[in-house]
């Protein structure tokens, strides 16, 4: 029987304002209903990479004090309200430099990788993000990350 591999800690949880349901991870839909052309509309339409990175930082911080920073310290190890998550998202959004008006897409994977590595270097984490386009070894890399209790994005 194959070995099951997955995260060992509970994933990020956010209580939705409109339904009181709990999501696993953030949702760029939290910015729904924003005026056309607004920054919040850009977050809704192109913020999936930022959500992924924000969730990764928060998961690591939930996992170990070593990964807590001034950016995530107030949001660890609890169910966040939707408004709290949006505040946290905005902190990460500013760290990443935001999404410029008129952008045709969200943040590139390379930019997310560099931002993660910058944060890891500043905080002396022994982690490094890598971006790879080849599918060779993909499942082995995913299994390795999950084996180290690191979400795959």
For each of these PLM feature ranges, what is it?
Residues 1-109:
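Active-site-adjacent structural segments surrounding the nucleophilic cysteine of cysteine proteases
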Residues 82-153:
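Conserved active-site-adjacent core of cysteine acyl-enzyme catalytic domains
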């Amino acid at each position: 029987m194959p070995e099951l591999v997955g995260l060992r800690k509970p994933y990020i949880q956010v209580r939705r304002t409109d339904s009181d349901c709990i999501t696993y991870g953030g949702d760029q839909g939290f910015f729904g209903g924003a005026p056309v052309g607004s920054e919040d509309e850009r977050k809704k339409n192109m913020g999936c990479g930022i959500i992924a990175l924000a969730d990764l930082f928060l998961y690591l911080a939930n996992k170990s004090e070593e990964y807590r920073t001034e950016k995530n310290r107030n949001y660890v190890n609890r169910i966040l309200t939707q408004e709290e998550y949006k505040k946290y998202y905005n902190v990460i959004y500013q760290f990443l430099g935001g999404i410029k008006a008129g952008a045709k897409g969200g943040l590139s994977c390379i930019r997310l990788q560099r931002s993660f590595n910058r944060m890891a270097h500043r905080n002396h984490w022994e982690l490094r993000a890598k971006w790879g386009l080849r599918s060779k070894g993909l499942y082995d890399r995913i299994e390795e990350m999950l084996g180290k209790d690191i979400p795959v994005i």
